Amino acid sequence: MSDISVFGDSVLKGVIYENNIYKVSQNRFSNICEDILGVSIENKAKFGSTIDIGKNIIFKNIELIKETKSKYVVMEFGGNDCDYNWREISEDPDKEHYSKSSITEFIEIYSYLIDELKKIGKEPVLLSLPPIDSAKYFDYISKKLNADNILKWMEGNKQFLTNWHERYNIEVFKLAINNDIPIIDITSKFLEIKNYSNLLCDDGIHPNEKGHKIIAEAIKEHIEKRKIELIG
């Protein structure tokens, strides 16, 4: 039986992009947290998870969640929800395109999950999103596609990628406030670094191993500052 369960996307899973290959790092934040906090973590995050996919994973593991020793359940979603089908945009930039989860869907499903976890006596804890690097990410998504068409759809503004990602991140903070639950601010820890891009992989969206160390430090600081008892 694990102490704490965590659910989310590839960032939470600990996926890094190295030498054009995605892999799960053994130095991911959850492994670091196990060492520095002295707890066992059941990492149920999954590559590509949107909030809707995450909902299905959480309900599939509801008994595991009930059995974990801690009252806390950690969630981190949004990075895939705000993403688009870049191939479709590349092929037809004049068409209207939609992100994988609309803002409305994202808020509604996340709120539902928070309520359902509270019903079984758990306290949801949200992680905010690490920022992305628009330049790196644009190069990554446009590889083997029509970069000019993608940029046309963005109205010539690569910074749209960062802005749209942050739009969802803001909703994560609002969800925590509106539902009176804890949020661990990962975002600010990255933004404190003058060139936080050095904490990201070459795809511009996944934290590298240095980035995962920063995430673990943010979690540790949050717990120590508030004198939180993880177990009991």
Regions found by a protein language model. Give the residues of each.
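Serine-esterase "nucleophile elbow" of acetyl-processing enzymes
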Residues: 1-47, 62-67, 73
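Structural motif
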Residues: 49-59
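Alpha-helical cap/lid subdomain in secreted, periplasmic
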Residues: 59-209, 213-232
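A short local structural element in Rossmann-fold oxidoreductases
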Residues: 16, 55, 195
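Gly/Ser/Thr-rich beta-alpha loop segments that engage phosphate groups in nucleotides
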Residues: 10, 16, 47-50, 80-81, ...
